[in-house]
Amino acid sequence: MDLAGLLKSQFLCHLVFCYVFIASGLIINTIQLFTLLLWPINKQLFRKINCRLSYCISSQLVMLLEWWSGTECTIFTDPRAYLKYGKENAIVVLNHKFEIDFLCGWSLSERFGLLGGSKVLAKKELAYVPIIGWMWYFTEMVFCSRKWEQDRKTVATSLQHLRDYPEKYFFLIHCEGTRFTEKKHEISMQVARAKGLPRLKHHLLPRTKGFAITVRSLRNVVSAVYDCTLNFRNNENPTLLGVLNGKKYHADLYVRRIPLEDIPEDDDECSAWLHKLYQEKDAFQEEYYRTGTFPETPMVPPRRPWTLVNWLFWASLVLYPFFQFLVSMIRSGSSLTLASFILVFFVASVGVRWMIGVTEIDKGSAYGNSDSKQKLND
């Protein structure tokens, strides 16, 4: 391991990142709280401000991926479609197999200048996660309980609110509903057999209702669906903790632009269309494992400096008073004060590790297990 790699793996560096993220995140969340005063006066101004405040938080994680870890991303796509990326609203359909696939989705959004306005369809429990979850609340993310009877109305209402959103955005959605594991895959394929659907090797059975309602609600606002199939070279299985340790990965992302008018309006036909899409995604993954590459032309969208600039700004803002406080405590010589300081740091570290744990595959939700079993029994 070289000197830079050794430095990046040090716990002290991780604590600095944790402190900057938590301190700046809570400051930004507080500012977002006060922006609620704007909502009844000027809703669009509220949205534009929160779009930029959101960028201040999410770009810190993208900075870790792109600058600290140095992870590279090659996009395989049609050059004609590439020219439209970042210039239109789009629904981005991502496979859900890796712990950092959400971060790669954010990186894609950042490369095309849409990170601040990017939306997700996320489980409602994430709305209570400090900093990121609260940020999502203020930027009108679409939350679901993953119980269709409850979500039918609430998700449609949330999506309708995005029809007049003033910023360009990618709406990121994992149609599989939960992250891929072998156990979930086995149960999902039992459901596929029971429904007479083709077997998928590298994906779970897509959940069509959420996708159909998203397309229906955003039609004539969103221009296209971007079908994105993600994989990593050398059979690597990247983790957020690995990114924090500065480990470099190389992502390959196959992106197909599908005009929204090509997607059926009827829900049943839309469902059949999505199942066919996932059969094609599965074939692309199989081809990648066989050849190590995706179809179409490889392109590397340039890494933008703004994520790094944003982090340096917040780091300088919150670290200077912190070090002043630290020096004053050391000079005081009070054992109680120092013990309190260490305790606060320990709690902060545990808190960030807990947020990282939300992304870990082996600690993921049991949704894909229990819900698929229920469908199998129906």
Swiss-Prot record:
<dbReference type="GO" id="GO:0006654">
    <property type="term" value="P:phosphatidic acid biosynthetic process"/>
</dbReference>
<keyword id="KW-0444">Lipid biosynthesis</keyword>
<dbReference type="Pfam" id="PF16076">
    <property type="entry name" value="Acyltransf_C"/>
</dbReference>
<feature type="transmembrane region" description="Helical">
    <location>
        <begin position="307"/>
        <end position="327"/>
    </location>
</feature>
<keyword id="KW-0594">Phospholipid biosynthesis</keyword>
<keyword id="KW-0812">Transmembrane</keyword>
<dbReference type="GO" id="GO:0005741">
    <property type="term" value="C:mitochondrial outer membrane"/>
</dbReference>
<dbReference type="InterPro" id="IPR002123">
    <property type="entry name" value="Plipid/glycerol_acylTrfase"/>
</dbReference>
<comment type="pathway">
    <text>Phospholipid metabolism; CDP-diacylglycerol biosynthesis; CDP-diacylglycerol from sn-glycerol 3-phosphate: step 2/3.</text>
</comment>
<dbReference type="GO" id="GO:0003841">
    <property type="term" value="F:1-acylglycerol-3-phosphate O-acyltransferase activity"/>
</dbReference>
<comment type="function">
    <text>Converts 1-acyl-sn-glycerol-3-phosphate (lysophosphatidic acid or LPA) into 1,2-diacyl-sn-glycerol-3-phosphate (phosphatidic acid or PA) by incorporating an acyl moiety at the sn-2 position of the glycerol backbone. Exhibits high acyl-CoA specificity for polyunsaturated fatty acyl-CoA, especially docosahexaenoyl-CoA (22:6-CoA, DHA-CoA).</text>
</comment>
<comment type="similarity">
    <text>Belongs to the 1-acyl-sn-glycerol-3-phosphate acyltransferase family.</text>
</comment>
<keyword id="KW-0443">Lipid metabolism</keyword>
<dbReference type="Pfam" id="PF01553">
    <property type="entry name" value="Acyltransferase"/>
</dbReference>
<dbReference type="GO" id="GO:0008654">
    <property type="term" value="P:phospholipid biosynthetic process"/>
</dbReference>
<dbReference type="GO" id="GO:0005789">
    <property type="term" value="C:endoplasmic reticulum membrane"/>
</dbReference>
<keyword id="KW-1208">Phospholipid metabolism</keyword>
<feature type="short sequence motif" description="HXXXXD motif">
    <location>
        <begin position="96"/>
        <end position="101"/>
    </location>
</feature>
<keyword id="KW-0012">Acyltransferase</keyword>
<feature type="transmembrane region" description="Helical">
    <location>
        <begin position="11"/>
        <end position="31"/>
    </location>
</feature>
<dbReference type="GO" id="GO:0005783">
    <property type="term" value="C:endoplasmic reticulum"/>
</dbReference>
<dbReference type="GO" id="GO:0016024">
    <property type="term" value="P:CDP-diacylglycerol biosynthetic process"/>
</dbReference>
<dbReference type="GO" id="GO:0012505">
    <property type="term" value="C:endomembrane system"/>
</dbReference>
<feature type="transmembrane region" description="Helical">
    <location>
        <begin position="338"/>
        <end position="358"/>
    </location>
</feature>
<keyword id="KW-0256">Endoplasmic reticulum</keyword>
<feature type="transmembrane region" description="Helical">
    <location>
        <begin position="125"/>
        <end position="145"/>
    </location>
</feature>
<dbReference type="InterPro" id="IPR032098">
    <property type="entry name" value="Acyltransf_C"/>
</dbReference>
<keyword id="KW-0808">Transferase</keyword>
<keyword id="KW-1133">Transmembrane helix</keyword>
<keyword id="KW-0472">Membrane</keyword>
<protein>
    <recommendedName>
        <fullName>1-acyl-sn-glycerol-3-phosphate acyltransferase delta</fullName>
        <ecNumber>2.3.1.51</ecNumber>
    </recommendedName>
</protein>
